[in-house]
Amino acid sequence: MTDYLVRAIAKSGSVRALACVTTATVGAICKRHDTLPTATAALGRGITAGALMGALLKTGQRVAMRFEGNGPLKKIVIEADANGSVRGYVGDPKVHLLRPDGALDVNNALGRAGFLTVAKDLGLKEPYRGTVQLYTSGIAEDLALYLVESEQIPSAVGIAEFIEQDGTVAAAGGFLIQAVPPVDPLVIEELMTRIEQLPPLSELLHKGGNPEQILEQLLAGIPYDILEKRNIAFACSCSRERIERVLLSMGKKELSSMKKDQHGSEVTCEFCGEHYLFDEADLDRIIAEIAKQEG
């Protein structure tokens, strides 16, 4: 089934909500990075968070999220755009921690101490940046804290996954719900009560639940309109041309040393694993281009 996201708003205008299923996208990205189960769960949560945040953007805008902790996973790096494209990676894909009850321990894998940094490219001169301390290191709660503290929007986030014993991603998805200004405290109280009473999101997803069904449970009793449905998929923006521009920015001296010591350069994209090879002739051409630009 194609992954997709649904965006809705209460008829009163007081609440907006997003829900998505990201099973195939999480599976595809984790397969590229050959992640072990706990790293799969952590990266999967980041991917779902990215899809939700991307859906809050306007066309042409992008968001980057960096969860950095003091655990063995080290970091989760995610990029997403307004069109439903997501990519990401973790610091160590071979991390596999379990709780005493046998559940995947994402919180301690990332580490209890650390930061979430969000950068939004809104088409302005400089990206908007916000940073908060990790709250639980479970991803959903950390993202909600960021939205409340940095963007001043009362928000609740739910993200879940179901990983099989062999590491297969059986289900993944989530929701994001926000109170729309002017905020009504009674609306927030009602939403929090409703969220606390929800059945486990992982169970709903594993049973084949779709975004519409998530919204039905989340907004039960609240009249709402569905504004949009959009597909979600892995996409990487790396290219040989982009990598060449990076090499161009390094300068003649460093490229000349690279040519002498390494007889070329091999660059691997951290997001998709694609390898780009530049031989001595390529470096000579780039060095000549730099000299030409310098006049």
Swiss-Prot record:
It is found in: Cytoplasm. Keywords: Chaperone, Cytoplasm, Disulfide bond, Redox-active center, Zinc. One of its GO terms (molecular function) is protein folding chaperone. Its main location: cytoplasm. NCBIfam families: PRK00114.1 (NF001033). Belongs to the HSP33 family. HAMAP family: HslO (MF_00117). This is 33 kDa chaperonin. It comes from Citrifermentans bemidjiense (strain ATCC BAA-1014 / DSM 16622 / JCM 12645 / Bem).
